[in-house]
């Protein structure tokens, strides 16, 4: 599997640039042995809210939106210190949304905005959403358009290779990276 080969190259210092994969799995194969691999059936197409090409450099940070939303604002948060230390680099946030509904996602993004998570953001990247639950006929795009981050005037990229729907890019939090 190419994503596993890329991972091994990254941790051994033999790969510094990653590229999006061609296909991803929308639905996992039944796990019998645990060695089934990916069920690659869907074409990968990264999208932006404004449909423009993006080139952005900054310090990347993020993770599972479900988990970050729980930690945000607690004594384990640390975003104020991180923002202060790396504000000159600018931040590229990435999020993997595993189980949050679209409506919950909108509320969580508002909470993170109010806690200054996006104060020095240069871009925000979302992987493929694990849950597409909605009570109001949202799509990923309309969910992000209706959220507070759409008013930040920064690139918002979604449907990327960062999610519970593999394969996924290998991200090392805190490094300077360029997304293009």
Cite the ranges covered by each PLM segment.
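Internal helical hairpin/lid segments
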Residues: 76-137
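ATP/nucleoside-binding phosphotransfer catalytic cores, i.e., glycine-rich phosphate-binding loops
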Residues: 123-180
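Conserved anion/nucleotide-ligand pocket segment
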Residues: 1-66
């Amino acid at each position: 599997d190419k994503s596993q080969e890329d991972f091994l190259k990254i941790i051994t210092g033999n790969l510094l640039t990653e590229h999006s994969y061609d296909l991803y799995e929308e639905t996992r194969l039944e796990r019998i042995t645990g060695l089934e691999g990916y069920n690659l059936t869907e074409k990968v197409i990264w999208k932006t809210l404004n449909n423009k090409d993006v080139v952005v450099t900054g310090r990347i940070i993020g993770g599972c939106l479900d988990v970050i939303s729980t930690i945000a604002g607690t004594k384990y948060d640390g975003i104020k210190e991180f923002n202060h230390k790396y504000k000159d680099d600018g931040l590229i946030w990435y999020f993997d949304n595993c189980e949050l509904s679209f409506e919950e996602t909108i509320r969580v993004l508002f909470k993170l905005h109010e806690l200054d998570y996006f104060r020095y953001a240069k871009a925000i990247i979302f992987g493929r959403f694990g849950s597409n639950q909605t009570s109001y006929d949202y799509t990923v795009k309309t969910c992000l358009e209706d959220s507070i981050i759409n008013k930040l005037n920064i690139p918002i990229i979604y449907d990327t290779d960062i999610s519970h729907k593999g394969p996924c890019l290998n991200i090392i939090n805190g490094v300077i990276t360029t997304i293009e």
